Amino acid sequence: EQAMQGAADILRQSKKVIGIGSPRASIESNFALRELVGADNFYTGIAKGEQERLQMMLKVLREGGIHTPALRDIESYDAVLVLGEDITQTGARVALAVRQAVKGKAREMAAAQKVADWQIAAILNIGQRAKHPLFVTNVDNTRLDDIAAWTYRAPVEDQARLGFAIAHALDNNAPAVDGIDRDLQNKIDVIVQALAGAKKPLIISGTNAGSAEVIQAAANVAKALKGRGADVGITMIARSVNSMGLGMIGGGSLDDALTELETGRADAVVVLENDLHRHASAARVDAALAKAPLVLVVDHQRTAIMENAHLVLSAASFAESDGTVINNEGRAQRFFQVYDPSYYDSNTVMLESWRWLHSLHSTVQSREVDWTQLDHVIDAVVEKLPQLAGIKDAAPEASFRIRGQKLAREPHRYSGRTAMRANISVHEPRQPQDKDTMFAFSMEGNNQPSAPRSQIPFAW
């Protein structure tokens, strides 16, 4: 309460307050910051170049007219081209799905002989190392090289040129590339043949190569294949868990925010769950923050910028809070709280980032808090940002019940619950009450792990 009042007093006196959001914070938390500082003073906390690549990626997904498969669907593709992205490091689950896709050739051969999918020994015997083609381009070796039909190691610019050359070979209307040597041209012919001959080719790229041209080249290849009538898919991989969501919210880049602080136009800054040193040079970040009379940091882990902070609010991590993120497919995904930290330590003052920011906003405006549960924030997001209307359907509301019961987080066999706090007190306190979701922090409630729904809180 005292910290809120102190911060609110300084914010009221500041001539311009800016907010720096984060691609690892939820939609709700970024939105709460945007509401606190105003849409014009909200910055994404992403470097300018990265943000431009993110916007290009969103443009490709929105306007390209090319299907983006889910992780499970990636396994059904029969030719894969990975352009400039080391997916084993930036999208490990995608890399696993690509491995499965490559093995799909053996499964197809086995299916033709009426061998079931589960008979793995028979499939391996029939397949005899037969694989669907996988082509990988990167600046260095990757951990997918062992199953790739061909790998191309070259500077990022040359990888983009390769992509554009493949697109041109598939479709004459795509821009041509000059100066490609004969050996590389022969390889391009092989790739073109494999992609053109596939029923379901998949193109994978992303922002991690640090090149807008690579993303453009991947889009051109996918478009050229679509023009040939192929059932083509495109997968784009972003850098952080909610990069896509932040791109859809919009706002200035981190470079713009630092310029505001450096020139003195902004004299207070609120940084949300963002280690700014990861997105800009440490010297520039520290110099910019040193100029601001108020630096308020909200985070769940200790970062170097806290050395420059005047006030730090301890936020709940993803395991201790609820929220929504937008994944690389552009699909909204809700994450749910696993436990309440204050149950194990009553001295803990740890709130979700959006609760801290909304509480601060309410204190600044001297009004009552009107977001008391997650659904209220989601309704406010949908009202202000219609492009995010789909987040409401990512999971049922907090009022969802089955036969009047919430869904139990704990299975009936949750042994040792009474002993978990015995070192603190042998008297077991009441279980925490969850007002944000349809789950209960206990065994009490509906418990159907085999029910046909995705809201299952445990694997048993």
Task: Enumerate the predicted regions with their spans.
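Long, low-complexity segments enriched in small/aliphatic residues
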Residues: 216-219, 378-460
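RNase H-like polynucleotidyl transferase catalytic core
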Residues: 39-42
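Catalytic P-loop NTP-binding/switch module of NTPases
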Residues: 1-12, 16-22
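Non-catalytic alpha/beta scaffold blocks inside enzyme catalytic domains
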Residues: 36, 46-393, 456-460
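Cofactor-cradling patches in redox/metallo enzymes
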Residues: 20-30
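Short intrinsically disordered, low-complexity coil segments enriched in acidic
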Residues: 1-7, 371, 402, 409, ...
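Short, Φ-rich (hydrophobic/aromatic) sequence segments
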Residues: 11, 26, 163-167
